[in-house]
C-alpha cells in the first residue's frame, strides 16, 4: 500500500507500522519527538468564540454578534435574555440590568475603550445592577469591569438604530460549518492505512524582513538540536519555550494568519516564539519571522511539553566557532564571499551576524584568533540555569558558541583567575548549584547575590575545599561549568594580563 512521509510517497506492506514507513523513506526521527498522521478531511459543525444576541422590537427581530474575548463575558451574555435596552446616546447603548454577583472582577474609572466594544459596567457598585454596554465611538468609560469584554463583529449598523425598550429574547453561540482535517498523534509502533500521510516535522520559511528575530529562532533550534519544546497551546496559537534573548527590535509587524510564526519583542515573554492557529490582527509586540510551509497539522495536535522537529528555509549560516577551513566550506556552500581578518584558526566573530543579512549581502567578514587562545568550556545549564544565562549574557554567547571575558585579576599562587562580570545583573543571581565539599581545578563559577562582589566570574586553577572559582566561600559560589581545554593557558596568566580578552568556546557533551 502507498503512504506518504513528509509529502513523499512510500510503498509499504499492508501491516506496516509508522516505523516501517520511516525506514522505507530513509527518514529518522529522535524517540522523544511527536509524530502525527493525517487521515483526510471531514465536514464538521463547531461552536466559535462568537455569540449571537437576538433583540425583539415590535414585530421585528434584530441580531447582534459579539466576539467574546473572555470567558466571563460569555457568562455575562448568558444573563442577558429578558434584559432591555435601558438607554441610548450618540456614544453608547446600555442593556440591563444583569446580575453578575457570581463573577470575580475589578472596576476602574476613565478607561479608554474603542468603538463597538462590548463591556460590563457597574454604575452603582452593586453587582446585581450591572449593565452590558456597547460603545459607538472611542470613549472613556467609568466604572468598567476590567478584563470582561468583547467586540461587535456583525450588526454594527443596528446598534445606531436602537432607541430604547428593545428586549433580548435569547443568546446563542454562532456555529461554523467547516471542513476539518483529521489528524492524530501516533507512535512509531502504530499501524497505518493506505493513503495515510505521516508528518514528522514542521518546515518554516523565514521572512527576509525580520533578520534579528529569525536569528533568535535559528539559534533556539541550533541549541535544541533541531527540536522545539511546546510551552503553551490554545485555540489561537502554540507557543515555544524560548532561549533567553534581550533587546529584540520591532521588525516586520504584520497580520498573524494561520501558520505565521512570530517572536515577541518586549515584555516578560520577550523571545517567546508563537505559531498561530487562527488569524489575528497585527500587534507591535510581535515580529513576524516566518510561515509554516509544511507540517502545520502537527502543531494542531501537540500538547504542552511535547517536542517537535523543525527545519527552516534557509538554515542557519553561522561561522562563529568554526575553523577557517570549515568557514570557507560553509561560505562556498551558500555562495558567500568570505573575508578573513586576523591571524589564527578559529572564527570568534562575524559581520553581519544574522543569517538573512549574510545571504542578502552575499558577503561575510570574520575575525579569527589562534586556536590556543580559545578556552573550551562546558556549561551546566540544567544545574544552574539562571547563572548560565547570566554568563552567556555577559560574554555575548546568548546566540553564539564563542564569547569574550576580560581578565579582572590573575593570581596563580591563589589558585584562581577572575574575570569581569556585570554587577547590576549579578546582584539578581540567587544561590544555585553551590559546591558541597570541594571545588576541583577547572571549575567555572560566578559569585551570587549573597556576596558583595556579585557577578564576578572565575576559574579554579587548583583544587580547594574552602573557596570557589572567584575566591568566595561555597555559599557565595554558583558552579556553572568547567574548562574542557585550555586550563594550562589560564595558569600561565598573571597580573600583567589584567584587562586582556580571553575567548571561550562552548562545547556540548557528557560530563
Curated annotation (Swiss-Prot):
Disulfide bonding pattern of the chain: none
InterPro entries tied to this protein: Cyclophilin-like_dom_sf (IPR029000), Methan_mark_3 (IPR016466), PASTA_dom (IPR005543)
Domain of life from the UniProt record: Archaea
Family (UniProt): Belongs to the UPF0288 family.
HAMAP family from the UniProt entry: UPF0288
The protein, known as: UPF0288 protein MK0796
Species whose genome carries this gene: Methanopyrus kandleri (strain AV19 / DSM 6324 / JCM 9639 / NBRC 100938)
